[in-house]
């Protein structure tokens, strides 16, 4: 399922409704994969998602989101009672380009 997200502090951050299937699945099994929306030049990251609920970190996530997406959301957007905020710590990443499909695949381990 597509999500808005931000790369910061060596992790991928995003939020989802607390009751969504995405949140429920990650709370049951924290292993996950994240990919870019560009199918011609994809980057795929696999890692572990951790629920974030401390106010200081949520305030930083909100600032990153507002800056990236030019929004003006308030902390209500990340209220832990209604929404889940996750930090995905990457284990590895894989990328390739459509121009050099067979020669460009690259893998990084973190």
What residues fall within each predicted segment?
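Alpha-helix boundary recognition
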Residues: 27-28, 66
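Charged, gly/pro-rich active-site loop segments
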Residues: 41-110
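Short beta-strand segments
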Residues: 1-18, 23-26, 32-37, 43-48
